[in-house]
Amino acid sequence: MRLNSTEISKLIKERIAQFEVFNQSYNEGSIISVSDGIIKINGLSNVMLGEMILLPNNEYAIALNIERDTVGAVVMGPYIHISEGAKVRCTGKILEVPVGDNFLGRVVNALGFPIDGKDSIQNDGFFPVEADAPGVIDRKSVNQPIQTGYKVIDSMIPIGRGQRELIIGDRQTGKTALAIDTIINQKQSGIKCIYVAIGQKLSTIINVVKKLEENNALFNTIIVVASASEAASLQYLAPYSGCAMAEFFRNKGEDSLIIYDDLSKHAVAYRQISLLLRRPPGREAFPGDIFYLHSRLLERASRVSMEYVQKITKNKITGKTGSITALPIIETQSGDVSAFVPTNVISITDGQIFLESNLFNSGIRPAVNPGISVSRVGSAAQTTIIKKLSSGIRTALAQYQELAAFSQFSSDLDDTTRKQLNHGQKITELLKQKQYSPISIAEQALILFVAENNFLDDISIDKITKFEKEILIYAHNYYFDLMEEINKTGDFNIVIKDKFIKLITEFKKNQF
């Protein structure tokens, strides 16, 4: 069979039309050094700061140093098997973590992979770990409370949804306990919680998970873990990953609470990475951008407007405002709040809860110092009944602490001073609270009403705890409707005042 030139030409054209060229270009380079989780790469061009770099065995590094001829990157995980001369390439993407409702009740690592031994997690998408904070126009004022369940905090240092409130104090003063109790108190409120453990011992993290399970609060919580045994790169990344997970709920018009435990260890991990990258050290050997490290993280916590939620969901969700409330924790050394990292975070946040070792050791739990603890925006969000009943508590405590210091130098005190000291001691005793026992708004209101209206005058200090426990039981048994009404509305009026007086009078007459 002979083909003529026309048929040959047609056949060649068909083959050319069907020919597919599998041609793909990569921005590729090679590793020139590996040490302590830091790799130096030569040959990469057009690299973005924070870009993911693909390593052999489908592992990744993040570009943190971009120099004239080389790129410095930090490996996300083990680096033992990485060798010099290995080929790497740019991905053109920044790091993203999986997010979704299915992460609630689970323990994940800084990259969003489950580490609790349960099934894999079906995610609802991916969010970038580094994201811009909402602008001024997109924000809404903080005017809704978030209840911690602690009398001393909800009455004197109230926290609002969308606020950033620092918990600061020496080691072993109850910082984590306060944060965990706040999570436990949210199980009825519908607020989604994220607990980020940075540089903690695994035994401590296991204990936190166990306590949340025991108090039926784990179902509402995501735990992000970068333990002390993990690479500094993962400890650096963990808070940003946790914040991305919180932003998923905020963007749906829901309220979320995120706890960073703690940012001191986060700063140390970043210092380690920066020194290994040969960045110039500054004060306390921290790099120059240590303030920006925490400010860009904490500025993402805010309350956003309905328009923002509507815009970000492309009109799928309307009429809802979302929020991220951040409770960063900072550990001080011997009560020194003027150190570099504590002063940075104090200046970024909207207030601080200061926990003192001497108060903790003297049996006052939570060991909050009301004198230097402050909430800059939370008072606007405080429940009406708590706001009205707590106005005199801070003043009474401040006067008591001043007089207590003065009375050490004088044995001869007049009756007025003695009464003030006695009243202050009783209020201090009344504000004590055990761990894992948060109380409701109505219970707080009743206790504050007792303190504010001098119903403790005829009760000795050693019986205050018993009095508090029994009056709350009495209130739930005989005034259940009143307590439920206060929990729902948070209002305070003459009717509620009269019922409180009747309740306390009846209890003291018949039961105590």
Swiss-Prot record:
F-type ATPases have 2 components, CF(1) - the catalytic core - and CF(0) - the membrane proton channel. CF(1) has five subunits: alpha(3), beta(3), gamma(1), delta(1), epsilon(1). CF(0) has three main subunits: a(1), b(2) and c(9-12). The alpha and beta chains form an alternating ring which encloses part of the gamma chain. CF(1) is attached to CF(0) by a central stalk formed by the gamma and epsilon chains, while a peripheral stalk is formed by the delta and b chains. GO terms for cellular component: plasma membrane; proton-transporting ATP synthase complex. Keywords: ATP synthesis, ATP-binding, Cell membrane, CF(1), Hydrogen ion transport, Ion transport, Membrane, Nucleotide-binding, Translocase, Transport. Its EC number is 7.1.2.2. Its main location: membrane. ATP binds at residues 169-176. It is a peripheral membrane protein. Belongs to the ATPase alpha/beta chains family. One of its GO terms (molecular function) is proton-transporting ATP synthase activity, rotational mechanism. The record marks 373 as: Required for activity. Produces ATP from ADP in the presence of a proton gradient across the membrane. The alpha chain is a regulatory subunit. It catalyses: ATP + H2O + 4 H(+)(in) = ADP + phosphate + 5 H(+)(out). CDD domains: ATP-synt_F1_alpha_C, ATP-synt_F1_alpha_N, F1-ATPase_alpha_CD. InterPro entries: ATP_synth_asu-like_sf (IPR023366), ATP_synth_asu_C (IPR000793), ATP_synth_asu_C_sf (IPR038376), ATP_synth_F1_a_nt-bd_dom (IPR033732), ATP_synth_F1_asu (IPR005294), ATPase_a/bsu_AS (IPR020003), ATPase_F1/V1/A1_a/bsu_N (IPR004100), ATPase_F1/V1/A1_a/bsu_N_sf (IPR036121). The keyword Translocase applies. It is found in: Cell membrane. It comes from the Bacteria. This is ATP synthase subunit alpha. The keyword Translocase applies.
